[in-house]
Amino acid sequence: MPDTLRFLVTGAAGFIGSHLSEALVDQGHAVVGVDCFTDYYHRRTKLANLARLRKAKGFRLVETDLSSGRLSPLLKDVECAFHLAAQPGVRASWGKSFSHYVKDNITATQRLLEALKDNQIKMVYASSSSIYGDSERLPTPEDTPPRPVSPYGATKLEAEHLCYIYFRNFGVPVVGLRYFTVYGPRQRPDMAFAKFIAGISRGKEIDVFGDGEQRRDFTFVKDIVTGSMLAINAKPGTVYNIGTGKTTSLNEVITTLESIIGKKARVKRLEVALGDVRNTSADITSISRDLGYRPTTSLAEGLRRQVKAQLLE
């Protein structure tokens, strides 16, 4: 990779997008950050995510909607695009809300690919472990047949299909990354760890869906960013998992948070939510072999960093 490049980062004001944008700017690259500031969570949270970036010389923020705005001007002199913008959330993707997922996860991706195809700009697409559904293969390799069990997972898979279609038919150099449960500072307020930390620290009940023995491959945001940046040099048309290859139960996470915060959790058990899967685990053999990816942050250390950042906000 050249010493300096110009990147487009969609979803730049979000949890992962803001960390990725910072890492790129810190390496001396120029970043055009795009975000439409949906009402999924409060605008001030996203603006806080951008606090350091907005002071950086190499960062420019553009507020626009990928599903309807003019995209060609955003791509001027851009050499690589990271497409992280999406409507997140498994549990919120049912019913009337589904139209938002179609617009932001499918239509927006198709329009960006259209804009990229004439310029042959490389795109790294942020997909999700949700496309696998309740996989019986654990750890789950990339060649596992996708069977999403939520509308959210279905829209992320459809966006992957669009990426392949534009790669196959127009030669758009796309690389797909399937992120496994990301956590860390700036985690969205609707996500489990953010809710657990807020509840435990304030002595309030925290909701746990099911028995808490469901296991996830929890991946620290810094490791996600590292893997994403390595994908700049990946072969177009490839798809990689980004995780740790290790799993932890929700009950174990809660016990660790109790130790870090110094308070006992008040757990409220609820029925398993629609679209939730029992276990996830990333097989990271391919990305480790091809790109040299190595996750470096233990869950305990990552949780300590998230607790510190969240309680200091």
Question: Which sequence ranges carry the predicted segments?
Answer:
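Conserved hydrophobic/aromatic "anchor" residues
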Residues: 15, 125, 132, 180-183, ...
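Hydrophobic alpha-helix immediately C-terminal to the catalytic Tyr-X-X-X-Lys motif of short-chain
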Residues: 158, 162, 166, 196, ...
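A conserved pocket-lining segment of Rossmann-fold NAD(P)-dependent short-chain dehydrogenase/reductase
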Residues: 93, 143-145, 172-185, 196-219, ...
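Conserved active-site region of classical short-chain dehydrogenase/reductase
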Residues: 106-114, 190, 222-225, 229
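C-terminal substrate-binding subdomain of Rossmann-fold SDR/epimerase-dehydratase oxidoreductases
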Residues: 20, 200-313
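N-terminal Rossmann-like NAD(P)+-binding domain of SDR-like oxidoreductases, especially those catalyzing
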Residues: 1-182
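A short, amphipathic alpha-helix embedded in the catalytic core of nucleotide-handling enzymes
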Residues: 112, 166, 195-200, 227-231
